């Protein structure tokens, strides 16, 4: 106070004011401080001081030709005096106003294209809806979030190459544009930015915003997709939140969401196949999301979700070192443990073999709706501090932590037998057995856990076995906190291995992920997911299996046809026919298959009975292991639309309808494709398939000796003729082609010639 009084007294004397405002600053230290280096030391002051001058701006000399000396009001726009130390002109701020009003205009066509991300943001905000503001405690946890809506997912290096190619195409330096997305973007941007006058550096900067994902580690309480993060400052404070619905979606959020759905579907489907890992890879490689190959997205997209990480591990990509249990991501923050097998008895006296972690460890647990800090020793929970959105979410976290602790009182709380199985009907491992058991009903677990009196700690509160809050007592070692636990911030990725049952381990052999951890939540994808793999046909139900099977046959008819006549067994074993079997009534599968195979054999033997449409129609039925029976069928049943529907062996039905006029096939009313050849021609009769590489010349000609069997033909030299016995004892004259013919000789010609030769 004394000092302030003294200063007040000084300031009241006019001499003090004069000294402070008028005298020059000539203290060397001060002059040095403000003049050394190029960096402005006090930009705000400098700006104020400059703008107080008449001509604070310098410009190139050319400005004198482009701007008049005075404006309409007669104010001077530039001074004839040169800027000290350069040959530039001193200009007034009024010149900027004049230029903005009267200066040359330029085409604005490129602005929305270059500043695309900004224009789109404005649109999203314009159409967004802001709801009421609520005042309440915000449990924010730091998560790694995407702060840049509307971007592609190129790596920094890939983006750099694209930007160089688009903005500085003539610069020297090797640029490798390999990925599909790189090439597409480059082509698109070059077209968009032809004759663009915007400064190349600005264009490059804006392109980077469009191409690369930028993430930050931010405290978030609500939605984490990028369209919510861009308005984070408007939607959540320390003690308030504002409801907000984005006015539009962006491709990157849609990709993340659709990728998770595709990965979950694929992992679930792979789990039940004979070789889960091989199936998973086959599906990842043949799936497209929004028209982009899933494997390309997996390589670029940093989304961390259990199913996505399993797919990445299968592809040999690095993933986060944290592990997953009960839908929570665990990250060990201190301590260490060794694993040891131990046998324990449940409350039902069932023996479980569990792998016990021996040693003191601390973990952070992060889930979608709850987070926690867990401290544990060997088979003992020391402390659990939980925070969550609601009672239910907190309970979920507590159950997972209790099971993870492997405490004896938890194992003794099991009532009844543990026999949970996964989708492939295999027993779950003991830890997941326990988890499933208590997720179904945790009453006994909470009752048996024990309670303790608690101290009054700021921001902490107790929780009772019935999940109600309390300030006096709490479940032993467990407290509920107002503060969330931050997600693990590191983006470090580690090398992992995956076994054929899709269990992912780090290099020490710890299991990080397994299919049991993949969420069963079903969602609707934002982008179209195209599963080309036949394993995924059943995802959309029986109708989809039916349509897809027939579409596949038609698409591959050329090769199917040859296999049908030469190597049917191999054809019947194709995996594309597997899903179809689930539509055929179990009891009838073998009989149908035997019947169809016999029918096909007759077609191969009897000339002219070959019928493309019928082969296509009946082929999927032949894939089941056949039963030898004399049974004949006029229709075959498939289970779709909740009941049995009939496919007629001869003729059309609502299930399978071939239109001769349009040559198109409809299956259950859906178009399944067109047959490119004329089915009436007995298409490529078997004969021409068998006689590949031979030209049919006409009827038998005795001069060329006795009729050979089809097998003996292989001995003919090129250009040599011979009689050959085909079908039901008909003999025709053939010549071995002089050049090797394509896989399918013009089949219709061949069939016609056989007919002519015989008739």
UniProtKB/Swiss-Prot annotation:
The record marks 627 as: Avian adaptation. InterPro entries: Flu_PB2_2nd (IPR049110), Flu_PB2_6th (IPR049114), Flu_PB2_C (IPR049115), Flu_PB2_CAP-bd (IPR048298), Flu_PB2_middle (IPR049111), Flu_PB2_N (IPR049106), INV_PB2 (IPR001591), PB2_helical (IPR049113). Its main location: virion. A motif (Nuclear localization signal) lies at residues 736-739. GO terms for biological process: 7-methylguanosine mRNA capping; cap snatching; DNA-templated transcription; symbiont-mediated suppression of host gene expression; symbiont-mediated suppression of host mRNA transcription via inhibition of RNA polymerase II activity; viral RNA genome replication. It comes from the Viruses. GO terms for cellular component: host cell nucleus; virion component. It holds the Pfam family Flu_PB2_5th. One of its GO terms (molecular function) is RNA-directed RNA polymerase activity. Influenza RNA polymerase is composed of three subunits: PB1, PB2 and PA. Interacts (via N-terminus) with PB1 (via C-terminus). Interacts with nucleoprotein NP (via N-terminus). This is Polymerase basic protein 2. It comes from Influenza A virus (strain A/Turkey/Minnesota/833/1980 H4N2).
């Amino acid at each position: 106070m004394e000092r302030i009084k003294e200063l007040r007294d000084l300031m009241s004397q006019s001499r003090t004011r004069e000294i402070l405002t008028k005298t020059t600053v000539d203290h060397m230290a001060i002059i040095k401080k403000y003049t050394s280096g190029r960096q402005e030391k006090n930009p705000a002051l400098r700006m104020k001081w400059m703008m107080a001058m008449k001509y604070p701006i310098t410009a190139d000399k050319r400005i004198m030709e482009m701007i008049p000396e005075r404006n309409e009001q007669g104010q001077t726009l530039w001074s004839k005096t040169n800027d000290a130390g350069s040959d530039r002109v001193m200009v007034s701020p009024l010149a900027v106003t004049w230029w903005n009003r009267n200066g040359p205009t330029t085409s604005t066509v490129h602005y929305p294209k270059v500043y695309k991300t900004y224009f789109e943001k404005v649109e999203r905000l314009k159409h967004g809806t802001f709801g009421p503001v609520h005042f309440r405690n915000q449990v924010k946890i730091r998560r790694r979030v995407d702060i840049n809506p509307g971007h592609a997912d190129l790596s920094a290096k890939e983006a750099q190459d694209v930007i160089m190619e688009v903005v500085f195409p003539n610069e020297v330096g090797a640029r490798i544009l390999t990925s599909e997305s790189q090439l597409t973007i480059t082509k698109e941007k070059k077209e968009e930015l032809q004759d663009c006058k915007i400064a190349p550096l600005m264009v490059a900067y804006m392109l980077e915003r469009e191409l690369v994902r930028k993430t930050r580690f931010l405290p978030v309480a609500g939605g984490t997709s990028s369209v919510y993060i861009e308005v984070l400052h408007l939607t959540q404070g320390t003690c308030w939140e504002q409801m907000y619905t984005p006015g539009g979606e962006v491709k990157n959020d849609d990709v993340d969401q659709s990728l998770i759905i595709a990965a979950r579907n694929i992992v679930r489907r792979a789990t039940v196949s004979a070789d889960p890992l091989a199936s998973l890879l086959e599906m990842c490689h043949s799936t497209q999301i929004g028209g982009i190959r899933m494997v390309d997205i997996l390589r670029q997209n940093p989304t961390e979700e259990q199913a996505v990480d399993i797919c990445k591990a299968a592809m040999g990509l690095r993933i986060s070192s944290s592990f997953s249990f009960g839908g929570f991501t665990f990250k060990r923050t201190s301590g260490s443990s060794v694993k040891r097998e131990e046998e324990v008895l449940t409350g039902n006296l069932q023996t479980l073999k569990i792998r016990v972690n021996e040693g003191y460890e601390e973990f952070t647990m992060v889930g979608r709706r709850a987070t926690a800090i867990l401290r544990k020793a060997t088979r003992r929970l020391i402390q659990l501090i939980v925070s969550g959105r609601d009672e239910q979410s907190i309970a979920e976290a507590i159950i997972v932590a209790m099971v993870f602790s492997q405490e004896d009182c938890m194992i003794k709380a099991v009532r009844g037998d543990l026999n949970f199985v996964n989708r492939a009907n295999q027993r779950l491992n003991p830890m997941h057995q326990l988890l499933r058991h208590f997720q179904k009903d945790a009453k006994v677990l909470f009752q048996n856990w024990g309670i303790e009196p608690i101290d009054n700690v700021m921001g902490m509160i107790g929780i009772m076995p019935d999940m109600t809050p309390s300030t006096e007592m709490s479940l032993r070692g467990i407290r509920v906190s107002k503060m969330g636990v931050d997600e693990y911030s590191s983006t470090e990725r580690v090398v992992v291995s995956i076994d054929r049952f899709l269990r992912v381990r780090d290099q020490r052999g710890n299991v990080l992920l397994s299919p049991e951890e993949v969420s069963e939540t079903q969602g609707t994808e934002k982008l179209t997911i195209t599963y080309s793999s036949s394993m995924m046909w059943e995802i959309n139900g029986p109708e989809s299996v039916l349509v897809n099977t027939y579409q596949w046959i038609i698409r591959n008819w050329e090769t199917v046809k040859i296999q049908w006549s030469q190597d049917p067994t191999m054809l019947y074993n194709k995996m594309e026919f597997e899903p179809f079997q689930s539509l055929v009534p179990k009891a009838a599968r073998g009989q149908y298959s035997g019947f169809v195979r016999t029918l096909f054999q007759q077609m191969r033997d009897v000339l002219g009975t070959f019928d493309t449409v019928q082969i296509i129609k009946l082929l999927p039925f032949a894939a089941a292991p056949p039963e030898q029976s004399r049974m004949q069928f006029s229709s075959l049943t498939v289970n779709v639309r909740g009941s049995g529907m009939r496919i007629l062996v001869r003729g059309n039905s609502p299930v399978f309808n071939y239109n001769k006029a349009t040559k198109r096939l409809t299956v259950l009313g859906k178009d399944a494709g067109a047959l490119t050849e004329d089915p009436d021609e007995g298409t490529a009769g078997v004969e021409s398939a068998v006689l590949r590489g031979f030209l049919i010349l006409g009827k038998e000609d005795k001069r060329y000796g006795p009729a050979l069997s089809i097998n003996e033909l292989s001995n003919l030299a090129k250009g040599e003729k011979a009689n050959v016995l085909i079908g039901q004892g008909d003999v025709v004259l053939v010549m071995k082609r002089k050049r090797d013919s394509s896989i399918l000789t013009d089949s219709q010609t061949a069939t016609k010639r056989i007919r002519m030769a015989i008739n």
